[in-house]
Amino acid sequence: DMISILNRYGMKATFNLNAGRIANQPQRVQFEDFEEVYHGHEIASHTFTHPHLNNLDLGGIAYQVVKDRELLEEVVQKPVQGFAYPYGLKQEFPDMVNCLKCCGLRYARTIRNSHRFTLPEDFLRWDPTCHHEDPEFDQLADKFFKPDDLEHPWRIKLKLFYIWGHSREFNGNWELLDRICQRLANKDIVWYATNGQIVDYVSAFYALRRSVNGKFIYNPTDVDLYVCVNKQNIVLEKGKITILE
């Protein structure tokens, strides 16, 4: 099935779940199976019952997010701070996104395929690269894995290939997922990460402190960060000051 294929290829996924629909739908992964099934992946919110957010006022949106978070967090025993818009972010109204932030969410994914590899300017309006059934997937993969980039890693700009979809859309055609994973897996130059891991990593970069002359960088976080300076890959070790030559 989906997760066994992802695990076989070392891929990482974020699963956006509606806590209010799980108990009444036995075909879904049940709460008691979360730890075993989703181990190594991320659990994120998708609202409590999957309503159209545009049909709700801000209080209704807050309820859907907070209730979903509360139940999911009770199961996974850690903060759930990610989100995917049910039916996508189609018609944003004033304060909708700010409401999500006030509910403790750090990022929210849309369904607008960008066909780009850039990090989002706003993680609460995070457009993915493509859907798993996108007819341009192979061309996008070719563009992402440019041979010259692999031979000259200092030329690489930070890129993110973000694929989204629904498990039901595979309709049992797990050969498609297997082909996608084969195409993307086992690249030494790629970090395979969940949404939350990406947000944490980018947030850690924003926390770096540089000296006026740029020679000294202090990493106050608990994450090792990687940069390229003068064609040299450098690790900014967590909790330490790095001197750049």
Predicted regions and their residues:
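Short, well-ordered alpha-helical microsegments
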Residues: 1, 91-94, 226
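N-terminal carbohydrate-binding/catalytic regions of secreted carbohydrate-active enzymes
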Residues: 2-5, 22
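C-terminal domain-boundary segment and adjacent tail
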Residues: 17, 21-23, 73, 107-118, ...
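A short, Lys/Arg-enriched amphipathic alpha-helix followed by its capping loop at the start of a domain
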Residues: 4-11, 183
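Metal-dependent polysaccharide deacetylase catalytic core of the NodB/CE4 family, i.e.
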Residues: 9-96, 101-106, 110-130, 159-167
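A short, acidic, amphipathic alpha-helical segment used as a generic capping/interface helix at domain edges
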Residues: 137-154, 206
